[in-house]
Amino acid sequence: MKILADQNMPLVEQYFADIGEVERFDGRQLTADQLIDVDVLLTRSVTQVNNELLAHANKLSFVGTATIGVDHIDTQLLNDKNIAFSSAPGCNAIAVAEYVISSLYALSQENARPLNNQTIGIVGVGSIGSCLAQKLQALNLTVLLCDPIKHAQGLLNEHVALDQLLAQSDIVTFHVPLIKSGEHKTLHMMDKARLKALKPGLTLINASRGDVIDNQALLEVMQAGADLDLVLDVWENEPTILIELLEHVRYASVHIAGHTLEGKARGTQILYQKFCELKGIEATKSLDEFLPVPAITQATLGQSFNEADIARLVHLIYDVRRDDGILLRDLANNGFDSLRKNYPVRREFSTLTIQGDSSQLAALAQLGFTVAN
């Protein structure tokens, strides 16, 4: 069995080597000819799986994407061709939520504005948005939720309409899929009219899809003097992003919000488990076998622990400003995709075990840290 996997997917050999021969490919350079005699295709979001790509896929029986979103996959085409498909729902939800939390604490420190005095609006309450909401609510922060699809399905009673949420929030973070048309279209949901109407001092965070915000309109609004704090991990037209926008962004990164070691490896594991299920193979391998011990594993709290100390713990594991520095310094020389490919190892909050008798331990556990018994 021949297995073709994106070069940036971790642990594919460890999970799939007993099943077949694993070959790697560049996610943006994959061609139809490379799929000749391939049985399994494992991708990420940079690869468009469409009729053109599958033109010579004579043996393909399974396509898996190690991502939550599936807007890069023609799922109807796969169904028509009787090719099994799986995404990896929830694989990087924790990672993206932690990216946002790191950004929130960094902004709070730099702007001298405590988080408990601010209202945070979350647009999109799927696996990532709901994960983030749970963590923020554990810290007793004020959170507003907007998800018209879930609301229509009766799954979100506390839904706040987008324009109302934008008006009432101090920070707005987007976690929606890219929907290009229809009633719930998210393509350019933040268009020039909405961007111009934003209240001064608002923080916008986008770690979903770059096309959710009209980047050219955002640049024009910022050039006209808009008072907005921007945290952008995703961009229109990646990897050829709008360079002029960078100087207006507080924290900028290269679509890596979900790129913890655990998050990426979890995506591979989910696809391995799904493939084994479809093929009737026993799934014997688990993530714990492969993850290395992190550099820092324990911390002890004192009684005087406060919000500033939570920020220090968060940034001990991951500080978004590190990635902002990498992008600004290296984009011109190395390019967007090279920075993604060579992204430094990043771990999740759960790798740090916290002990002590602080009253904050329960909140830290909800935030994702491991708390010693």
Swiss-Prot record:
The active site is at R209, E238, H255. SUPFAM superfamilies: Formate/glycerate dehydrogenase catalytic domain-like (SSF52283), NAD(P)-binding Rossmann-fold domains (SSF51735). It is found in: Cytoplasm. InterPro entries: D-isomer_2_OHA_DH_cat_dom, D-isomer_DH_CS1, D-isomer_DH_NAD-bd, Erythronate-4-P_DHase, Erythronate-4-P_DHase_dimer, NAD(P)-bd_dom_sf, PdxB_dimer_sf. Pathway: Cofactor biosynthesis; pyridoxine 5'-phosphate biosynthesis; pyridoxine 5'-phosphate from D-erythrose 4-phosphate: step 2/5. GO terms for cellular component: cytosol. Its EC number is 1.1.1.290. Pfam families: 2-Hacid_dh, 2-Hacid_dh_C, DUF3410. One of its GO terms (molecular function) is NAD binding. The keyword NAD applies. Keywords: Cytoplasm, NAD, Oxidoreductase, Pyridoxine biosynthesis. GO terms for biological process: 'de novo' pyridoxal 5'-phosphate biosynthetic process; pyridoxine biosynthetic process. Substrate binds at S45, T67. PANTHER family: FORMATE DEHYDROGENASE 1 (PTHR42938:SF9). Homodimer. Catalyzes the oxidation of erythronate-4-phosphate to 3-hydroxy-2-oxo-4-phosphonooxybutanoate. Belongs to the D-isomer specific 2-hydroxyacid dehydrogenase family. PdxB subfamily. HAMAP family: PdxB. This is Erythronate-4-phosphate dehydrogenase. It comes from Pseudoalteromonas translucida (strain TAC 125).
